[in-house]
Amino acid sequence: MNDIAHNLAQVRDKISAAATRCGRSPEEITLLAVSKTKPASAIAEAIDAGQRQFGENYVQEGVDKIRHFQELGVTGLEWHFIGPLQSNKSRLVAEHFDWCHTIDRLRIATRLNDQRPAELPPLNVLIQINISDENSKSGIQLAELGELAAAVAELPRLRLRGLMAIPAPESEYVRQFAVARQMAVAFARLKTRYPTVDTLSLGMSDDMEAAIAAGSTMVRIGTAIFGARDYSKK
């Protein structure tokens, strides 16, 4: 078993244990392997180990990887864009990715809707919440969610699937859980209004257990699977 396969197995075990501890089924939680800055060869190892969902933060890098595996004839992969999205890059996301986690304004949602090719299924989208109110992070306030969700739900080439957040780092589990719980409450409320909503993208390596206990359905894990990132190649 190679390192990536071994790491994936360990992460899956941690997800399973965290779910079991809070009375949830491990099948309720999707593992999104964050492959930004990692070569296609590393992703291929993860694919060989059964991983199918991959998250990319940089548009062109992600598109290059998507095309690479399409040209190889690899099917069944699911590509998630999880980085900040600029208007001038929206077409590439609309044309190539399956998901976008970082909807934080109607203008970008409208562009994605208009640019999504008719022959593709609707683009799955999550609204990003700036749950820790950090100036350095994208996302809307929870108070703005109702208005943006209603507008996004009307766009026919998008499918509103739920919420995403990147909480500020917290070392204490109790504080991690409190923040995650705020997201879970907003997610539950959104689910009652929109039948397509089923995804809460919340939790990374350091706060995964708290996120799962609070109700996350998707955790985003990178370094614990692929090792430290090399940004010099970006």
Regions found by a protein language model. Give the residues of each.
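Conserved alpha/beta-domain cores
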Residues: 1-206, 214, 226
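Conserved N-terminal glycine/acidic-rich loop preference
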Residues: 218
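Short, Lys/Arg-enriched, disordered terminal segments
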Residues: 1-2, 232-234
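Expand to "…catalyze enediolate/carbanion chemistry for C-C bond making/breaking, isomerization
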Residues: 210-213, 221, 225-232
